[in-house]
A protein has these predicted regions:
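Long, well-ordered mid-to-C-terminal structural blocks that present hydrophobic/aromatic surfaces
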Residues: 267, 283-321
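Generic N-terminal amphipathic, Lys/Arg-enriched alpha-helix
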Residues: 7-22
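Short catalytic helix/loop segments, enriched in acidic residues and glycine
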Residues: 22-42, 74, 78-79
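Loop/turn elements at helix/coil->beta-strand transitions in domains of secreted/extracellular proteins
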Residues: 5-8, 52, 110-111
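Acyl-thioester C-C bond-transforming condensing/cleaving domain
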Residues: 2, 43-45, 65, 80-286, ...
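A short beta-alpha structural unit
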Residues: 55-60, 271-274, 311-320, 361
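A structural motif shared across PLP-dependent enzymes of the aminotransferase-like
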Residues: 62-73
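N-terminal alpha-helical transmembrane segments of multi-pass membrane transport
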Residues: 45-57
Length: 419
């Protein structure tokens, strides 16, 4: 894996509030909000005339919103037409792919500054429609005709990990508890409640309805109860990410140009992308993702860094088991050992390797086409020391990583950042 031909930096990043925003807000509205937020994060200001292209990451506005050809639409809204405005699709890794392609384009010298857009409006469809649309990112020859859904596929992955490494349902629950605690501190998150707060709200509602009030001993007891129904064994409701509308915006600039816009650019140290068979049955094993390992290998080689150098990471927790697999595939922990990071607090906000300080997909939300870009927004904030509320980590972040996975691991993008 070669080096970037010239230095590339992130000079601004922003997002809209994630949530069930439709019908009050659609893709155009959310993208403009994210754009404005990102512009406001560029220290010395930036204007459309400064930007050479708009790279749009979007999974399936065609099916969610009956709107294709999204690139020019997003570019036109912020004054970037007639400049290039391609759209990139990689399932849930769509804006991760767009970000990586923008990095490569700037490094090549073709462009000096690119605006990266990640956007998805999912709640225009009912739950059944969302499930069916997401299923188009799985294998259509074998999995889809058999009735496979992503909860079912990740349940199979979780079951395999349980069997091989002794991982338990409680281990997954601890991932969700941690990420809800982080999401509580993120004003842009869809679900800004910790698990204890969710428990308290349910108790209050039961009392108002005159129902028997459950006597949950703690968060784990609550998550084992009928209040957290089984979706696809062993995955329960709170193991699954949210159905979300949202948008995020990143400004990527060449190194010699970046200093015009900020004195504190966040440098792109390395980036990589991997792939795998869409169908689980075609893979050698399913207790990890080969696409993640390949993308990480490329990003580490390009950056000259390794897993031990990373201080903070945003990883793709579309299901709680996915966060555990990501930590192992990225080399942070040996196979079967990542659950210890949850138990002993290493991956908590004040731990030695904070994971998903944004709340992750579990709490921040998962508007699939915007997820990868939103991860970069969180890293930008943490490295700048501007994360809101009580979410800012207690140390100066010099090196960070984002991990954006598509589907059941068919696509992965890993990017490493450095001050």
């Amino acid at each position: 894996m070669g080096k970037l031909a010239r230095k590339v930096a992130m000079i601004g990043a922003g997002m809209c509030k994630f949530g069930r925003n439709f019908p009050l807000k659609r893709n155009p509205d959310m993208w403009v909000e994210a754009w404005i937020d990102a512009v406001n994060k560029v220290d010395n200001g930036i204007e459309p005339k400064d930007i050479d292209a708009c790279y749009v990451g979007n999974y399936s506005s065609d099916l969610f919103n009956h709107q294709g050809h999204l690139g020019p639409q997003m570019a036109n809204l912020v004054g970037l037409t007639p400049k290039p405005a391609p759209r990139f699709e990689g399932a849930c890794a769509s804006s991760g792919v767009a970000l990586r392609q923008a990095i490569i384009a700037v490094a090549s010298g073709i462009h000096d500054i690119i605006a990266v857009s990640g956007v998805e409006c999912m709640t225009q469809l009912p739950t059944t429609g969302v499930t069916d649309t997401l299923a188009t990112a799985s294998d259509d020859l074998f999995e889809y005709p058999a009735g496979a859904t992503f909860p079912g596929l990740y349940a199979a992955i979780a079951s395999a990990h349980f069997h091989k490494y002794g991982t338990t349902a409680e281990d997954l629950m601890r991932v969700g508890i941690k990420n809800h605690e982080n999401g509580k501190e993120n004003p842009f998150a869809q679900m800004q409640q910790s698990i204890p707060e969710i428990m308290a709200s349910k108790v209050k509602r039961y009392e108002q309805q005159g129902r028997d009030v459950p006597d949950w001993k703690d968060e784990i007891d609550f998550l084992k109860s009928s209040a957290n129904p089984m979706i696809a064994s062993p995955l329960r409701l709170f193991d699954c990410s949210l159905v979300t509308d949202g948008a995020a915006c990143i400004f990527i600039a060449a190194g010699d140009v970046a200093k015009k816009y900020t004195d504190t650019p966040i440098w792109i140290a390395g980036t990589g992308q991997g792939s795998a068979s869409l169908s689980l049955h075609d893979r050698d094993e399913i207790t990890g993702f080969i696409a993640t390992r390949e993308a990480a290998k490329q990003a580490y080689q390009m950056s000259g860094l390794g897993p031990k150098d990373i201080q903070i990471a945003e990883v793709h927790d579309c299901f709680t088991i996915a966060e555990i697999l990501a930590q192992e595939d990225l080399g942070f922990y040996q196979k079967g050992k990542a659950v210890e990071a949850i138990k002993n607090g290493e991956s908590h906000r004040n731990g030695s390797l904070p994971i998903n300080t944004s709340g992750g997909l579990k709490s921040k939300g998962h508007p699939v086409g915007a997820t990868g870009a939103a991860m970069a927004v969180e890293i930008f904030k943490q490295m700048r020391g501007i994360a809101e509320r009580n979410r800012q980590v207690k140390f100066d972040v010099e090196r960070a990583l984002t991990h954006n996975l598509g589907g059941s691991g068919g696509t992965c993008v890993v990017t490493v950042y450095q001050k």
